[in-house]
Structures are given as C-alpha cells and as structure tokens.
Amino acid sequence: MKTIHQTNVGGAGGFYTGMEYARLADADWIWCMDDDVFPRLDCLEQLLAYAGYEGVGILAPRRLLEGRIYTNDFLSFNLTRPFSSMYSGRLSKMEVNSPVEISGTAFEGLFVRGEVVRLVGLPNKDLFIFCDDTDYCLRTVAAGYKILYVPTALMDKEKFFSDDSWGERNKKKKWKRFYQIRNSSYLNHHYGKNWAVKYLRGFNGVIGYILIAFFSAPFSGAYRWTDIPMFWKAYTDGIRERLGRL
C-alpha cells in the first residue's frame, strides 16, 4: 500500500495525484473511491467479470445508502436543452437488474482502465471539488469508450449530517455550494452545444441559490445576504472558465 501526503487540493486534486501515480506504475485498472464508500467483499470480483467487454473504459458499481439503492448515474448527457438537466435518464428512476451502458457516474467506486487514463488524461484538478467525475466521464465517452454500470458490484455509502436540521446541514455544506455552482456552470459552458446551454442553464441554477439565500437569511444561520454576490461570482467564474481553489 502506498500513502501519498499532500496539501489540501480537494477531491479533484486527490484523484489527479492518485491516478497519476497509478498511471506511472502502468496499472491495468485503477479503482477510485471517496472516503465515505466501502466496497463489499466481492465488489471487485463483480466488476472484473466485465473487464473484458469490448470498448469498456469504466466500470461503475451500485452504491447502497442504509441498505437502499443510492445512485446519481445516468444514461446520457443533455447538452442541447437548457431548461432540462444535463443528466438524462437517471438510473434512480429505473429498475436495473443487469449491467447497462451509461454516460456518467461518480468517483465513488469508479473503476477505470489504465488505457483510458493514458489516452484521456487525468481528472481536471482545477475543479477542486464537484463535477470532476462528470467532466472525466464526458471526456471518456467523447474518446469512444463505454461506461458500464454493474448492479451486482455493491458498495455501501456512509450518510453524513443525518441528524442535522436544514439550517445546520446547509451551513456546513455552504462552502461546497460555491464550487458546485462554478463547476456546473463551467461544464455547461465548456461542453454545451448552443448559447442557451452555455449560459442559461448555469444562470437558472445560480438564481435558485440566490433566492434561497435571500429569503432564508433572516430566519436561519445557513445563508447570509453577503453570500449572494459570492454565488453570482461563482457563476461568472464558471462561464469564464476560471477555475482553481476559491
């Protein structure tokens, strides 16, 4: 086992460093996961059963939260319709009992072929946190590889902030919201196929957070009115593709 110590470079920077080390070690496959997921004993075995499928570059396990299926995996990217989500065909709305080809998954058990990393490159470390996995899946699919969701490969996901109130939970997560807004705006601007997706989808998203902050600030400790210009800056940084640690 190799432990790498570095400064706080966010989740994206952590995956960048880990995957770079594995690539230099000429790894055939690289298993990426956050610290809040725990693979079942046969999870890797179940993933490897599909490693030989033609064109597969990434294998994605099924995650369970408190014993129930937890997934934000999806079938395809929507890069043309600005008033619909970027993520089309969410598996959370389907019953999936056999492997299915998808377009996006999370860095929570993502099992990527070393060949993909050598061709597509490393995660975008300048995203810091949020959307680095979506960006990587976009690049992988664009390079012609398939992503396969394997429902028999199971991982358990830990639940954080389970006993917190709405205000407490959002106060703890607020710093992440700025990255979420900026990076999702960046993705839409960078990969969107038309002006509306590039600018309006991110705008719609940030307006929602601005309204929540405006109306909840007097009544909860989650947001303050001073957060509003910061939310707007996160959006403008995204569409100008200014990344890095905030």
Language-model segments: which ranges?
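Short beta-strand-to-loop acidic/aromatic patch adjacent to the donor-nucleotide binding site
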Residues: 27-36
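A recurrent flexible, glycine/aromatic-enriched loop bordering the glycosyltransferase active site
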Residues: 92-112
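Conserved donor nucleotide-binding strand/loop of the catalytic core
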Residues: 1-13, 21-24
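Acidic donor-diphosphate engagement hotspot in glycosyltransferases and nucleotidyltransferases
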Residues: 15, 42-44, 132
